């Protein structure tokens, strides 16, 4: 498929012919050194586009080298990472029979055959004693293992090896032959990297198609690398409904296969054992499954919805556009630490990241977005200058309530809030999943109004948060959203955002939460470092800012017959409930 950019038509065949020749070798696909992983279902702008003239780029060879080495990106970095024998430390990656013959002759002469890892299947008969592997391996994994690499001059493994600080021997002439022409190739490595990444290449943001510089491209690839590397450990995924899998396919992809969902792949808990890892969406998994897995020596993590979830309700089967994966313990259960808690407690959050978090917070508030992307709308304070306090209802059988709710129900919350705020104008906002008719936690309005001044259903949570003075929550994410708007927050349970010096906490906060964090440090950990996000347009894993932009521009709406059916089912349940009450 061709892509027209700035009047220059580039397709895969023309790229190979124009820039790198037509020969395709292991790790040398004829494609640019920086390229996107083939995430399942992704349809995106190309990251790199060939142009007949060099685009100006402020990056230097040294800066590019540092970024590549830090991110371990370039080449097929999403390739497999098989266990490599320690005594097989000489990597041979020939591109032709001529190169293979030269390498084999040297290995035999130096009696190295039994130390050789031979990459590729075409030449396996030429060197008895060598261990042969496929050519789909992550080149950074190979280079990190090797004590020396012998490769053809067009093989990007040569550049990866040099960047890894390992000796590389070049056979033949080609793209990376300068690495074999001088002693001490680090002297010329910076220039070679600059030429490779900047000459006759432009970089495009795959989410927008706009120009981006090489360092930004490397940073994006490094984020994808971290995601893929985390996913490599997963042996099975349990409890994920079919309608959620379009999102999870990309966010749990390990570089070679779709996530190994237990139901579709026939995987069973009993087939897993010591050394395996599994992920569980606990609300849909068989009871006791995580405990059985852990007793069998299986490292078990949890999947849950992220904090900026979707345009629409999960109870209506709207797929999430954000998830969290946690191998320590789910973030809403204060009984044990979670990876989120450890980030908030211990992470070294840089000034740049704090600035990014502040920008993100301002964007979310300006767009009026909440967890379900509902937008701001309008809501006027009904009691003028009187103190207005929002009380947020929750799904009472939700795991966050059962784990961190400290036994407080929606009815308890309303009464406690009135006791603490005797003179305030109290607004009760029922949870949207409860209002949709799917979940537990409904309270008759007449009961609510014994303590609250108003039951508000139509205004969005963002509109309410913008206009109230304070918020009372059990564990609701609305408390975190209120903090981002500078509101006073009282927690009656133990949500993840309690205990960091930003809230008034009435629940029993774990003593291990000792850090005092700024609001933007909390935002950085909670919305940038911890979750995973999927762009609904390109289907690529994305930075949080991309998803926020899509939601703000109404580009994140998902529709399906199942969603329509669930919406109608909820409306029917709600109507029947009101009929029963009025009977």
Per-segment meaning from a language model:
Residues 1-583:
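Catalytic-core helical/loop segments in enzymes performing group transfer/polymerization on anionic/lipid-linked
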């Amino acid at each position: 498929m061709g892509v027209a950019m700035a009047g220059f038509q580039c397709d895969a065949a023309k790229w190979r012919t124009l820039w790198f020749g037509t020969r395709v070798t292991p790790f040398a696909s004829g494609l640019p050194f920086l390229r996107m992983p083939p995430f399942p279902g992704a349809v995106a702008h190309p990251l790199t586009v060939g142009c007949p003239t060099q685009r100006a780029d402020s990056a230097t060879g040294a800066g590019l080298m540092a970024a590549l080495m830090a991110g371990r990106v370039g080449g097929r970095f999403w390739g497999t990472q098989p266990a490599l024998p320690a005594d097989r430390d000489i990597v041979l990656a020939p591109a032709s029979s001529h190169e293979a013959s030269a390498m084999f002759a040297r290995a035999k002469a130096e009696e190295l055959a039994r130390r050789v890892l031979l990459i590729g299947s075409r030449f396996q008969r030429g060197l008895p004693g060598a261990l042969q592997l496929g050519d789909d391996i992550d080149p950074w994994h190979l280079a990190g293992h090797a004590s020396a690499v012998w490769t053809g001059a067009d093989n990007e493994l040569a550049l990866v090896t040099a960047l890894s600080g390992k000796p590389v021997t070049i056979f033949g002439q080609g793209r990376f032959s300068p690495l074999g022409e001088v002693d001490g190739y680090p002297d010329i490595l910076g220039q070679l990297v600059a030429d490779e990444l900047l000459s006759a290449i432009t970089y495009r943001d795959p989410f927008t198609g706009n120009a981006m510089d090489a360092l930004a491209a490397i940073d994006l690839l490094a984020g994808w690398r971290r995601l893929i590397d985390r996913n490599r450990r997963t042996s099975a995924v349990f409890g994920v409904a079919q309608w959620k899998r379009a999102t999870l396919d990309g966010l749990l992809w390990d570089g070679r296969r779709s996530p190994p969902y237990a139901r579709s792949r026939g995987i069973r808990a009993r087939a897993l054992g010591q050394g395996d890892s599994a992920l569980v969406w606990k609300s849909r998994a068989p009871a006791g499954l995580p405990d059985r897995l852990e007793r069998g020596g299986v490292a078990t993590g949890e999947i849950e919805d992220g904090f900026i979830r979707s345009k629409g309700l999960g109870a209506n089967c709207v797929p999430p556009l954000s998830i969290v994966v946690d191998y320590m313990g789910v973030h809403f259960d204060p009984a044990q630490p979670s990876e989120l808690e450890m980030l908030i407690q211990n992470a070294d959050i840089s000034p740049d990241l704090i600035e990014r978090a502040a920008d993100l917070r301002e964007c979310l508030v300006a767009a009026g977005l909440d967890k379900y992307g509902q937008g701001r709308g309008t809501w006027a304070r009904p009691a003028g200058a009187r103190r207005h306090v929002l009380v947020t209802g929750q799904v009472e059988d939700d795991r966050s309530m059962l784990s961190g709710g400290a036994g407080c129900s929606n009815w308890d919350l309303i009464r406690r809030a009135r006791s603490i705020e005797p003179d305030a104008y109290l607004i009760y906002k029922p949870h949207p999943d409860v209002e949709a008719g799917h979940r537990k936690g409904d309270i008759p309005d007449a009961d609510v109004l014994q303590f609250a001044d108003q039951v508000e259903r139509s205004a969005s949570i963002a509109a309410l948060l913008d206009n109230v003075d304070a918020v009372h929550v059990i564990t609701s994410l609305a408390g975190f959203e209120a903090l981002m708007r500078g509101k006073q927050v009282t927690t009656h349970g133990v949500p993840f955002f309690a205990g960091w010096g930003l809230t008034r906490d009435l629940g029993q906060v774990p003593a291990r939460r000792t850090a005092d964090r700024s609001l933007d440090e909390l935002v950085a950990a909670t919305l940038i470092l911890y979750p995973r996000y999927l762009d609904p347009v390109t289907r690529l894993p994305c930075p949080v800012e991309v998803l926020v932009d899509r939601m703000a521009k109404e580009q994140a709406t998902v529709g399906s017959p199942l969603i329509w059916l669930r919406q109608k089912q909820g409306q029917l349940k709600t109507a029947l409930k009101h009929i029963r009450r009025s009977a």
